[in-house]
Amino acid sequence: YGLLVGSECISRHLDMTDRSSCILFGDGAGAAVIELDDSRAYTSLFGCHGDLDVINCTNKAGERSLVHMEGQATYKFAVSTVPKLIESVVKKAGLTLDDIDVFICHQANARIVDAVARHLKLPKDKFFMNLHEYANTSAASLAIALSDAIEKGICKRGQTLLLTGFGAGKTWGAVVIDF
């Protein structure tokens, strides 16, 4: 068994006067117990650009570190990276895009998820979205989205799911799972 946990209390690190960033994020936590089935292949891919210059958390003593989102740069990064990642992990699993019943992407931005679906020529309804309910919960978004999709009956036993995320440090990852 494995435990997938994501939690974020990002509101402590937001400048509430910076409307370009503060309205994008929400606090949250999610968890799932995952069992590896020895009769099934486990397929995942992870990567990063390897340049940690994009993460700059320096601050003066006594000052709060604040999050600032570079929205356009994040959009370009995600839209150029996530579709290729999805295609690669699906191919590695020996599947096609049509074999995936539900795609659950990091809930960063609806425009990003829509662009990924368009790039892959897939209907948007195959991509679960709950961003409108929770905002971008950062590290918690995939665990929350998976839990929410299960509770809402979107993910059903026997389906093949693809979870994919991206984030700080220009990192990315995807996993194909049988539910």
Where are these regions (language model features)?
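Structural motif
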Residues: 1-3, 30-32, 40, 102, ...
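Condensing-enzyme catalytic core mediating Claisen C-C bond formation in acyl metabolism
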Residues: 16-80, 84-87, 166, 179
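Active-site-adjacent elements of ketosynthase-type condensing enzymes
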Residues: 1-22, 45-63, 108-118, 137-144
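A polyampholytic, Gly/Pro-enriched intrinsically disordered region
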Residues: 1-2, 63-68, 147-156
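Phosphate/pyrophosphate-binding loops at sites that engage ATP/ADP/AMP, CoA/4′-phosphopantetheine
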Residues: 84-101, 149-154
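Short beta-strand segments
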Residues: 2-8, 34-35, 163-167
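Claisen-condensing/thiolase-fold acyl-transfer catalytic domains that form or cleave C-C bonds
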Residues: 101-179
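Phosphate/ATP-binding catalytic cores across multiple sugar-kinase/actin-like superfamilies
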Residues: 81-92, 115, 119, 145
